[in-house]
């Protein structure tokens, strides 16, 4: 059972035991392959899958732009050069972390083998994966609690975040500040992650993820203006 105290303990354990920092040259190109190139590839996969589908213009009553609009607004040079290179999990979210209260030990499962071919990767990605898993509880999705409806050019999604998600987001943000990491990058990676996940899943989760990416992009850029 997740508690604020256990979440603090998890991040502290990850920082000392999991995320072993290491300097590498040319990490910007690796990040560009992982963030920019992969996103373009996944977007193309989605559009092949739904060649006749029109993206929603409103999501949950919020006006949103096209995915192309948001991808063009991203400062990819900043995103790919502002990195914290470390040994990372690659799919760092609650489903893949087991806690044993008897031994007070964490165990990670379902590791990703590489980050665009590199055995190390961008720590920001693990943090964004965790944030994305707080805002969208994958256990709830597997339990068939997800709801997606589209009508004309609008989409409606139900909230599938974890319980007390706002509090855990605040905790994660505080840990990022302690680690001197840029919270804006963590936030921006979340809709990129959702977008990249979208073509890999069946309906309606695929369109839910796509529309959720639009919604989070809209919130991010509206606050940035």
Where are these regions (language model features)?
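Alpha-helical elements of Rossmann-like donor-binding domains used by nucleotide-donor carbohydrate transfer enzymes
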Residues: 9, 13, 129, 171, ...
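Conserved kinase catalytic-core helix
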Residues: 1-56, 67-73, 77-82, 88, ...
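Regulatory N- and C-terminal appendages and interdomain linkers associated
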Residues: 61-65, 103-106, 181-225
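Preference for well-ordered, secondary-structure-rich cores of eukaryotic proteins
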Residues: 5, 34, 38, 66, ...
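A glycine-centered beta->alpha junction motif in the catalytic cores
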Residues: 1-7, 16, 48-53, 113-114, ...
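Active-site acidic catalytic loop and adjacent metal/ATP-binding pocket
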Residues: 69-122
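Active-site activation/catalytic loop segments of kinase-like enzymes and analogous catalytic loops
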Residues: 106, 114-175, 191-205
């Amino acid at each position: 059972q997740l508690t604020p105290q256990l979440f603090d303990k998890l991040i502290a354990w990850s920082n000392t035991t999991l995320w072993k920092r290491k300097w590498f040259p040319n990490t910007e190109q690796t990040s560009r392959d992982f963030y920019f190139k992969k996103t373009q590839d996944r977007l193309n996969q989605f559009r092949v899958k739904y060649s006749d589908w029109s993206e929603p213009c409103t999501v949950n009553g919020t006006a949103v732009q096209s995915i192309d609009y948001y991808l063009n607004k991203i400062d990819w040079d900043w995103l790919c050069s502002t990195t914290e290179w470390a040994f990372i999990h690659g799919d760092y979210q609650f489903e893949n972390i087991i806690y044993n209260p008897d031994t007070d030990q964490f165990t990670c499962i379902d590791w990703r083998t590489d980050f665009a071919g590199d055995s190390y990767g961008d720590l920001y990605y693990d943090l964004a994966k965790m944030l994305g898993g707080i805002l969208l509880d994958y256990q709830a999705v597997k339990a068939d609690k997800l709801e997606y409806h589209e009508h004309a050019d609008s989409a409606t999604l139900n909230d599938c975040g974890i319980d007390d998600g706002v509090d855990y987001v605040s905790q994660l943000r505080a840990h990022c500040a302690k680690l001197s990491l840029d919270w804006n990058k963590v936030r921006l990676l979340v809709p990129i992650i959702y977008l990249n996940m979208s073509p890999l899943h069946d309906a309606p989760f695929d369109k839910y993820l796509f529309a959720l990416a639009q919604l989070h992009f809209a919130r991010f850029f509206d606050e940035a203006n």
